[in-house]
Each structure stands twice: as C-alpha cells, then as structure tokens.
C-alpha cells in the first residue's frame, strides 16, 4: 500500500421487500432474532430501492456515512455489528488497473466512507431500513471480496435490521427464525425467483410519508412484553400459515395467497392494538382502502387483489394480473384523486405504463364503479407507486451512478 492517495469504490443497488407473512417480535434484541418465520416479496428495484456506494482509502481517518445527503453517526450498535462482521470476513483485494493491493490483514486498520440514498421516504413504513442495511452489507461484501453466499450475508444484514435479510434475494423470500442462540441459522432463503409469478402487479398507496410515531423496534418490544395475542400468533398461527403460503406461492394459487396475506396483515395490526399501550399504525385512509379491496373482491366473486400493511399507514395492494391492476388504478384514482395542483407524473410513480393503459381521461367504467362502491372515500394519499416482483441486489458498473467522488471518496 505504498501509494496513499488511492480510493477503491463499489456501488450497489438493493430492493426493498414487503412481508406477506409478518415479522413482529424478537426473542433476542441484540442479535435481532425473531419469534417466528416470515415471508416477503421483493419489489422491483427500478421502482423502490436503496443505492449505496462504499469506498476505502488509506487517506480516510475514520468511518463515515451519509444517508440521503446528510452525515449520520455510525456509533450505533447495529451499524457497528454489520461493519465488524463484514470486516472479519474480508479477503485480499487487488485492483490491477490501478495497481492497488489490499491484504486481508489491512482491512482492520483501513477506514470506510459510505453514502446511501433511498428513492422512497425513509421511516414511513416502506421498509427503508431493510433495503438500506441489505445494500450496506452487500456492497461491503463486494468491496472486501467476502466469499459468502447471500444466505450467509443475510445473517449479517439481519443484525442491522431484521427484514434486511430478506432483501438479499429477489422473488419470494423466507426468513427462517432459526433455533440456535448465536443466530447462525436465522437466515433468509429464496423460495422462488422474480420470474416464477410475474403476473402479479403491486400498487402502493403512500398514505403518509412522515415518520411514524412508534418505531418498529420499540413497537415490537412492547408487543412482546404485553400482547398475549402475539404469543398465540407466533406459536400457533404463523407456523401453519408459513406452510400454506409456501404452497400458495409454489402453485401460484392467488385465492389462497390473498386470504393468507390479508389475514396476516390484519392479525399483525390486531397485535398492535392488543399491545399496551396500543399502537396505531393505520389511519382512516388505510381503513378505507381495506374496505375498497374487500368490496372489490366480493363484487368480482373471486379474490383479485390482496392487501397488506407494514408498520405504517401505507397500503400495499397486490393485483392478480395486469388487467386487474389497470382497473384497480382507475378505481383508486377515482376514489383518491390528486389535488388540483398535482400532476399525474408526480402522483403515480414507478411503472407508469400502467397509467397509460388505465386511460384516465373521461368517465370511470360502470363495472369498476360497481366494484368500489360510491365515491365517498376521498382520503389523503400522497402518491401511488406501481411495481412488481423484482430481482435481488446488483453491483452497478456505471461509475456515474456512484454517490461518492472517485478521487476524494466524499459525497458528490
């Protein structure tokens, strides 16, 4: 390491995920070990993702991190756990183009710069910490030449944010709670890839992009301490639902999938209500969206849309296919129209081709009106995001997408 001015960087993109069988409650707060298994769908990173650039240089005097342009402290135990675990697995790195060699032993004394950016609101119930920690671990593993598979890396990401372990894969992912005290068997595994059930379309109603009043971490702790329903859920309900959900996903059985997804979301929020003091993540708009979907499915005579809510008011709706998704978007925009000064481009994000197909000029077709009922459900929706099941994390080769300057390792 004779030349002291060099900077080596890696930029990665990692998706977020939405749980269809929920994780709520830890049996070990430090290692972040859950009280039950969970299953999630990974969202297309083109629509919802974290971008992270990690850099190493002998000129850096300490580890530093910038999140969405603001420097944040890395002193928290979750960041420290992830950094320690990755550093302990680092290997020799050689950049022949730049003539740089980093020996395995050098990683202990070299410092890192990390810049991370979410393309969606942080801490508003859209699993930003999941994508964030998954991206951090994935990018650092690439930078340090860590030779471990995604499941092994998921055990490290889990120590930053529980649901982060599920963002290291695309498609549908299961987080095994594991039984060992050290957490070595509490890892994520891919059930199916993103092509297995690619008919599905996901529409998210961002009801509020403000930070929530009760964080997931404190909410879970209070539920574990006070909710009898949570104990029953973890022991009796979830193990059965996990098996049923795996079967539904394998067989692309949308009827079973919808029943399980909606029931599990509702039970999770019932647990929050059963917590002392009760936790309210959903609001009136969330409840109106549930009513809309329930009425829609009854009117259709068969489940066409599943809904699920994480620890926040945002509704995640999963449509059986694109035709249903187009009709659903029409209905949602009829019920929750944008404010007069908001244009459609900033009101419907993600896969905007659905907006074109929805043909939003003119009157709503009567068939859709029948499915959603009267237009008395106006509520505060900030915007919608259209997405689909997506792939896992990738390294971005295009250096123009890096968040750090290649010469200085400081934010651009």
From Swiss-Prot:
One of its GO terms (biological process) is sterol biosynthetic process. Pathway: Isoprenoid biosynthesis; isopentenyl diphosphate biosynthesis via mevalonate pathway; isopentenyl diphosphate from (R)-mevalonate: step 3/3. It comes from the Eukaryota. GO terms for molecular function: ATP binding; diphosphomevalonate decarboxylase activity; identical protein binding. Disruption phenotype: Decreased contents of campesterol and sitosterol (by 50% and 30%, respectively, compared with wild type). Decreased emissions of beta-caryophyllene (by 35% compared with wild-type). It is found in: Peroxisome. Keywords: ATP-binding, Lipid biosynthesis, Lipid metabolism, Lyase, Nucleotide-binding, Peroxisome, Steroid biosynthesis, Steroid metabolism, Sterol biosynthesis, Sterol metabolism. Performs the first committed step in the biosynthesis of isoprene-containing compounds such as sterols and terpenoids. Is specific for (R)-5-diphosphomevalonate (MVAPP). The catalytic efficiency with (R)-5-phosphomevalonate (MVAP) as substrate is 10000-fold lower than for MVAPP. Can complement a yeast mutant defective in MVD activity. Homodimer. This is Diphosphomevalonate decarboxylase MVD1, peroxisomal. The lineage of its organism: Eukaryota, Viridiplantae, Streptophyta, Embryophyta, Tracheophyta.
